[in-house]
Structure formats: C-alpha cells, structure tokens
Amino acid sequence: MAYAVIRIRGRVGVRRDIADTLKMLRLHKVNHCVIIPETETFKGMLQKVKDYVTWGEIDKDTLVKLILKRGRLPGNKKVNPEIIKELTGMDVEELAEKIINGEIKLKETPLKPVFRLHPPRKGFERGGIKKPFSVGGALGYRGEKINELLEKMM
C-alpha cells in the first residue's frame, strides 16, 4: 500500500524539526503531493507533521490520473502514456500498480517525485485548514477519502 501525502499549511511559524521532516518528505510548498510507501519510518514522520499535511491510501485509478495529468519529467516536460512506456518499459496502469504495491518507488522512475496540485475546487472541508479531518477540518489522516481530495485538486 502507498500513501498520498499533501501539504496543506504554509511555512510561517513552523518549528525547525517539523520543517526538517517536511523537507525530508519533499513537501516544500503548499498543495504539493508525494507518494510514499507505507512503512513504520514514514508513519512516524507523518505523525510528526500531522498538523501541516493530510494523507491517506491512494487507489490505482487516482494514481494513474495523477501521473498523466500532473506528472512531470525533468525539465518540466509533460507526461503522456507513450513516453512512460518508452522510459519505463511498462504502461501507466502497470506502473501505478507497482508503485502502490511497493515493488518500485516513484523516485526509481524518470518522473519527478513531487506532484504540483491546484487548490481544491470548492475549497477544503467546512472546518478549514486548522482542524483535523476527524472533527471536520482538512489535516491529518483521512484514509480512502484522500482520493476525493486529489480529484478536486487535479
């Protein structure tokens, strides 16, 4: 299983250790998204930055859409299925399946590891970006509902 992690809050007033963890996750700016494997190390990092990001389990269909719509190659070149097939030797669906199952990491592919997203259409949840998802906000763990948020942000 793989997590999609999206940075929600900015950099003003962030403690140094949390800023370092966000940097290690490659979440330098708001509305940036990374795909990480579900390991104990990453779970600990997510718990540390839970007040600045939201995360959940991404499904295959959403990852395919994310790669095709927001994936970039070095030099900020757009991605299409033919380029993916040429560079990796597999189609986009197969690549997404292997990333989700943890067989390969996104950084082992020619794609850039960070996806730059739009702010969500119709905004975040009613509670805003200062409250956890569990009480109606946008922060923290949200499980399968991360796919709905990613659809709104693509």
Swiss-Prot record:
Gene Ontology CC annotations of this record: cytosolic large ribosomal subunit
Organism annotation: Methanocaldococcus jannaschii (strain ATCC 43067 / DSM 2661 / JAL-1 / JCM 10045 / NBRC 100440)
Key words, A-Z: Ribonucleoprotein, Ribosomal protein
A GO term, aspect molecular function: structural constituent of ribosome
Family note: Belongs to the universal ribosomal protein uL30 family.
Protein name as catalogued: Large ribosomal subunit protein uL30
Highest classification ranks of the organism: Archaea, Methanobacteriati, Methanobacteriota, Methanomada group, Methanococci
PROSITE patterns per record: RIBOSOMAL_L30
Gene3D superfamilies xref list: 1.10.15.30, Ribosomal protein L30, ferredoxin-like fold domain (3.30.1390.20)
Xref: InterPro entries: Ribo_uL30_ferredoxin-like_sf, Ribosomal_uL30, Ribosomal_uL30_arc, Ribosomal_uL30_CS, Ribosomal_uL30_euk_arc, Ribosomal_uL30_ferredoxin-like
Subunit composition and interactions: Part of the 50S ribosomal subunit.
Origin: domain of life: Archaea
HAMAP family: Ribosomal_uL30_A
Pfam families in the record: Ribosomal_L30 (PF00327)
